[in-house]
């Protein structure tokens, strides 16, 4: 089975930026091992009851749909086990379990980068400001 499915499953199971990703990887080593962990093994990892509940749904259906769509579009899924996954993210406690990209993949560790992060329920003004900031950064070569 394509190991990216387990990374996508993990990403979908936990909130963005969850510190549990790093803790789980420190304990289990790989997303597949997290997926295969029993409820008891997850509890012993001391990640909290909420995270254990989030990881109790072992369905890979959503992960399959996401991966198939990404591949249909000719896009990329990068996971911490991929050589192109940025080292700067790999060693973050709340590292993303999966990154999605389109086009030619540069060496992301060798170029300056900026992340624009915000709430999922941003105001209209917040969206405009984030768009303007991102457009300005892109126009400036970031």
Language model features with spans:
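A short helix-loop-beta submotif of the ANL/AMP-binding
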Residues: 142
